[in-house]
Amino acid sequence: MAIKSYKPTSAGRRHQTCSTFEEITTDKPEKSLLVKLKKTGGRNNFGRVTSRHIGGGHKQKYRIIDFRRDKRDIPAKVSSVEYDPYRSARIALLNYADGEKRYIIAPLDLKVGDTVISGPSADIKPGNALPIRSIPLGTIIHNIELKIGKGAQLARSAGTFAQLMAKEDKYAQVKLPSGEVRMVLLDCIATVGQVGNIDHENVSIGKAGRSRWLGKRPKVRGVAMNPVDHPHGGGEGRTSGGRHPVTPWGIPTKGYKTRTNKTSTRFIVKRRTK
């Protein structure tokens, strides 16, 4: 994937960049794998805002992705690489030998016509899914399960990857994109390779309207609000907030750790690096 820039025909165009989408082979998704999702606007079933800065955006259909890769020892051919509006990575449509079709996250360098397979005896090549116990140390992996059979939860966004560092007893140590080293069960499934669309991080949105197309609403600064709306609000003229930075609910921010101790903490071998 490459990045496309524009001539500065307007202020919004001046610094705007966009993907060239050259790896995408079709703009018609597989209808049997599409689902309608209703937009929430960041509200819950009471109609109250539970996630701020969400709303609007282009109408989308959700693509059902196979994160479990539980179709063992049946080869599948890549029939297309497609855009997915619900994620930063591209997705690949697989046609299995028995006729079934499934979408997966498209790893780097996966092309139409390639064959992928999942199972403990699969080759170590991008797109193949294996139990971690069958993957050699040092291998670059993505789409990693945390619970056996639940489906991949780690290293799924564009350009991300994890690395298999060690195996001990029934656990493997995996270095995650954040720098955290974590223990994962050896029987959990992971996919070989790095997630594709690695230039996604270099895309410049360029203008406010493009964020609105993506369903992102403006983030208003606390110091620009009234005292009733935010702890930093109010004051005569422009002020700095008058206290250490806090969230709208008074919890310290900018470096303050809010993660509670939980059972899964014991699986973290090394904390993430800043």
Curated annotation (Swiss-Prot):
Residues 223-258 are annotated as: Disordered. Keywords: Ribonucleoprotein, Ribosomal protein, RNA-binding, rRNA-binding. It holds the Pfam family Ribosomal_L2_C. GO terms for cellular component: large ribosomal subunit. The keyword Transferase does not apply. InterPro entries: NA-bd_OB-fold, Rib_uL2_dom2, Ribosomal_uL2, Ribosomal_uL2_bac/org-type, Ribosomal_uL2_C, Ribosomal_uL2_CS, Ribosomal_uL2_dom3, Ribosomal_uL2_RNA-bd_dom. GO terms for biological process: cytoplasmic translation. GO terms for molecular function: rRNA binding; structural constituent of ribosome; transferase activity. The keyword rRNA-binding applies. Belongs to the universal ribosomal protein uL2 family. One of the primary rRNA binding proteins. Required for association of the 30S and 50S subunits to form the 70S ribosome, for tRNA binding and peptide bond formation. It has been suggested to have peptidyltransferase activity; this is somewhat controversial. Makes several contacts with the 16S rRNA in the 70S ribosome. Part of the 50S ribosomal subunit. Forms a bridge to the 30S subunit in the 70S ribosome. This is Large ribosomal subunit protein uL2. It comes from Geotalea uraniireducens (strain Rf4).
